[in-house]
C-alpha cells in the first residue's frame, strides 16, 4: 500500500511544472509577447531619464536643476537601472524555452519584483516632492516653487508620469513571472491518515 502511495506521489509531483514548460514550448507567441513586453519599458525609462537630466531652469530668482533634489537624482538612477535590466531580460526571454530552468524562473521573479518596487518608490518620492513644489506647505511656511520655476516643474512632472507608466508595465511583468513560477508547483494535498489516501486540495 505504501509503495502504491509513493508511486502516486511520484506520478503526481512535478506535473504542474511539466505542463507549464510544455505549454511555453508549444506557444512561441507567448515568448514573443513576453519579449516585447520586457522591451517596452526601455524606451519609457530612457525618456523619463533624459527629460529629468535636461531639467534645469535659470531666471531672476536663481538657478535650479534636478541634481539639487535627491528624489529626482534617485528617479534618474532608478530609470537607468530599469532600462538596462529591461533590455537584458528581454534578450534572455527571447531564448528558447529549453533553457527555462527553475533558477532562471526564480531569478526573473525576484528581479521583476525588485525593479517594480524600485521604480515605484522613485515615482512616489518624486511625486511627493512635486506636490510640495506646486502647493508648498503652510504648516512649516514653505512656499510653492513652481510659480517661479514653471518650466522646471512641468518637465519634472512629465518625467514622473512616464515613470508611472513604467511601473504599470512592471506590475504586469511581476504578475507574469509570479504565474510562471508558482504554476511549476503542485497544489498542496491532504493526507487521510485512516485510509492512507492522498487527496489534492485543488483536484484536477
From Swiss-Prot:
A GO term from the CC aspect: plasma membrane
Localization, UniProt: Cell membrane
The lineage's top-level taxon is: Eukaryota
Biased composition of type Basic and acidic residues is found at 1-11
Please name the Pfam families in this protein's record: CASP_dom
Where is this chain primarily localised? membrane
Cytoplasmic side of membrane: 1-32, 96-113, 177-204
Q: How does it assemble?
A: Homodimer and heterodimers.
- Name it: CASP-like protein 2A1
The organism of origin for this protein: Arabidopsis lyrata subsp. lyrata
